[in-house]
Amino acid sequence: MSKRAMKKIIPLITLFVVTLVG
């Protein structure tokens, strides 16, 4: 996976985790 894609995916994962935990 390219670093450019990672930069887009990481915030989405973070948001998903925050939604689950919160």
Curated annotation (Swiss-Prot):
UniProt keywords, alphabetically: Plasmid, Secreted
Primary location group: secreted
Signal peptide feature range: none
Disulfide pattern: none
Keyword Secreted part of the UniProt annotation: yes
Propeptide: 1-14
Name of this protein: Sex pheromone inhibitor determinant
Location in the cell: Secreted
Its job: Acts as a competitive inhibitor of the CAD1 pheromone.
Chain coiled-coil ranges: none
Lineage per the UniProt record: Bacteria, Bacillati, Bacillota, Bacilli, Lactobacillales
A GO cellular component annotation in the UniProt record: extracellular region
Source taxon at top rank: Bacteria
Further information: IAD1 appears to be a component of its own signal sequence.
